[in-house]
Amino acid sequence: MASYPCHQHASAFDQAARSRGHNNRRTALRPRRQQKATEVRLEQKMPTLLRVYIDGPHGMGKTTTTQLLVALGSRDDIVYVPEPMTYWRVLGASETIANIYTTQHRLDQGEISAGDAAVVMTSAQITMGMPYAVTDAVLAPHIGGEAGSSHAPPPALTLIFDRHPIAALLCYPAARYLMGSMTPQAVLAFVALIPPTLPGTNIVLGALPEDRHIDRLAKRQRPGERLDLAMLAAIRRVYGLLANTVRYLQGGGSWREDWGQLSGAAVPPQGAEPQSNAGPRPHIGDTLFTLFRAPELLAPNGDLYNVFAWALDVLAKRLRPMHVFILDYDQSPAGCRDALLQLTSGMVQTHVTTPGSIPTICDLARTFAREMGEAN
């Protein structure tokens, strides 16, 4: 091919431009790195925040324990974010919890089909999850990097949440799937909506023998609830799988690599109590991933459809960074409180992002409690 002078000049020009561009990029990166380092140093001077999410199956004693712990602190350094009961009963929909239990009862009695139940349950679960998801989004801009737990000074503020968004967007939908009143596709739709896990997400799950759990649940009075032992077994199973899933992921487990180890057999209704990170990495069959080897999610070749596989990638990404703690509820309320207080000493704090973040977060939490807390 002929060589033309204009091509030669263009080539030389391109080389010079690339060389200058490379040097310019290196020069431009220096102030960016310096700016980033400055931002990190400034953040490290910001006050710290401790966020604790008390979660697990209903009826263990979470709310009582949390309220006793909050009572130990002053109004300015510890704030309780309750369940959004008013939203569930009035603001978001009418008597959502009662609607859920009634729908499950009607399905169990053969009065409605599984498809009809799934429509109601999916709609109700959207209502259950909305306050958690939107509050997480409003809080997120104020959460900086993790400050660690070892020898950390007391946080400027401790937020105690009655549940994390995964309760409404993962655990209870998964339990309803085990109960036959929600489809696996709907469960994964909720999974796709789980907000990104913020730094310093400390989640406290509970352990309590099943007979003691049944006794406590039978004695409590919550508007709209029924004593549904099958649902209790299902939600206990799901939270056990959740704890295992976090351990599995943090231990280096990859659901894509281990998918072939799943048998596709039905998930047993009962399992061991949640465990801390001690011990060997759980088998994938003892994690939440086992729920999703369902025929409805599989292509003709037996593989997951990609859209569902991507949802499981989201699940892994959301659960892996969580700091999970296990609280033994098989003791007195005061004993539970003291055990929870001891757990907080090993939890991970975060720096806030602005000097005004702490009062803003306090206002957010108190507004949530005032507007959406327990209905009168």
Curated annotation (Swiss-Prot):
<feature type="binding site">
    <location>
        <begin position="56"/>
        <end position="63"/>
    </location>
    <ligand>
        <name>ATP</name>
    </ligand>
</feature>
<comment type="subunit">
    <text>Homodimer.</text>
</comment>
<dbReference type="GO" id="GO:0005524">
    <property type="term" value="F:ATP binding"/>
</dbReference>
<keyword id="KW-0067">ATP-binding</keyword>
<feature type="binding site">
    <location>
        <position position="125"/>
    </location>
    <ligand>
        <name>substrate</name>
    </ligand>
</feature>
<feature type="binding site">
    <location>
        <position position="216"/>
    </location>
    <ligand>
        <name>ATP</name>
    </ligand>
</feature>
<dbReference type="InterPro" id="IPR001889">
    <property type="entry name" value="Herpes_TK"/>
</dbReference>
<dbReference type="Pfam" id="PF00693">
    <property type="entry name" value="Herpes_TK"/>
</dbReference>
<comment type="function">
    <text>Catalyzes the transfer of the gamma-phospho group of ATP to thymidine to generate dTMP in the salvage pathway of pyrimidine synthesis. The dTMP serves as a substrate for DNA polymerase during viral DNA replication. Allows the virus to be reactivated and to grow in non-proliferative cells lacking a high concentration of phosphorylated nucleic acid precursors.</text>
</comment>
<feature type="compositionally biased region" description="Basic residues">
    <location>
        <begin position="19"/>
        <end position="35"/>
    </location>
</feature>
<feature type="binding site">
    <location>
        <position position="101"/>
    </location>
    <ligand>
        <name>substrate</name>
    </ligand>
</feature>
<feature type="binding site">
    <location>
        <position position="222"/>
    </location>
    <ligand>
        <name>substrate</name>
    </ligand>
</feature>
<dbReference type="InterPro" id="IPR027417">
    <property type="entry name" value="P-loop_NTPase"/>
</dbReference>
<dbReference type="GO" id="GO:0006230">
    <property type="term" value="P:TMP biosynthetic process"/>
</dbReference>
<keyword id="KW-0418">Kinase</keyword>
<feature type="active site" description="Proton acceptor">
    <location>
        <position position="83"/>
    </location>
</feature>
<feature type="region of interest" description="Disordered">
    <location>
        <begin position="1"/>
        <end position="38"/>
    </location>
</feature>
<comment type="similarity">
    <text>Belongs to the herpesviridae thymidine kinase family.</text>
</comment>
<protein>
    <recommendedName>
        <fullName>Thymidine kinase</fullName>
        <ecNumber>2.7.1.21</ecNumber>
    </recommendedName>
</protein>
<dbReference type="GO" id="GO:0004797">
    <property type="term" value="F:thymidine kinase activity"/>
</dbReference>
<keyword id="KW-0547">Nucleotide-binding</keyword>
<keyword id="KW-0244">Early protein</keyword>
<dbReference type="GO" id="GO:0071897">
    <property type="term" value="P:DNA biosynthetic process"/>
</dbReference>
<keyword id="KW-0808">Transferase</keyword>
<keyword id="KW-0237">DNA synthesis</keyword>
